């Protein structure tokens, strides 16, 4: 098995094949020249750092029935584990609540990441071996088309102040996603 993670140029005509080759070899790929700018990422990161450092986050506690909103520190544990993950996070859905102290950059990022995800799924469709793709019930991109269940999970791993974490770790392996 090849364990070389490829760097794939988003703008290259070979991108779909290179991307799938890297996924098949390692399960990963690095994408360069993608449409998400560093300045946008920096602004989003800054907004959410401010949000997680504020008490306003508690105004957006998650709704149990639809899972949107803020999930406090130690609110989740991985399937099959008893210890809590040492993180807090916020689920953003297209129809969900959105913190008033977070700028519009996150919504732009959400749209861009949706586009990027669609494109990568299209590459997998295009470059997958025929014996694999014929088992798909439909194209991968059509499986997520017009769904309101795509979410953006913004995660914060606060500094650990107490080194005695009682077996808790930053994030257990999650096999339920």
Predicted regions span which residues?
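Peripheral, non-catalytic segments flanking oxidoreductase cores
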Residues: 1-177
């Amino acid at each position: 098995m090849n364990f070389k993670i490829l760097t794939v140029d988003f703008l290259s005509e070979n991108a779909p094949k290179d991307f799938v080759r890297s996924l098949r070899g390692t399960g990963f790929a690095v994408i360069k020249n993608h449409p998400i700018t560093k300045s946008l990422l920096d602004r989003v990161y800054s907004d959410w750092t401010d949000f997680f450092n504020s008490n306003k986050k508690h105004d957006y506690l998650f709704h149990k029935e639809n899972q949107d909103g803020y999930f406090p520190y130690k609110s989740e544990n991985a399937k099959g584990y008893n210890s809590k993950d040492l993180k807090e996070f916020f689920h953003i859905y297209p129809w969900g609540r959105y913190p008033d102290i977070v700028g519009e950059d996150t919504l732009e990022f959400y749209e861009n990441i949706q586009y990027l995800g669609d494109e990568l799924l299209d590459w997998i469709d295009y470059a997958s071996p025929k014996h694999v793709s014929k088992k798909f019930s439909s194209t991968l991109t059509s499986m997520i088309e017009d769904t309101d269940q795509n979410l953006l999970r913004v995660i914060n791993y606060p500094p650990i102040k107490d080194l005695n974490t009682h077996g808790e770790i930053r994030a257990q392996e999650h096999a339920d996603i």
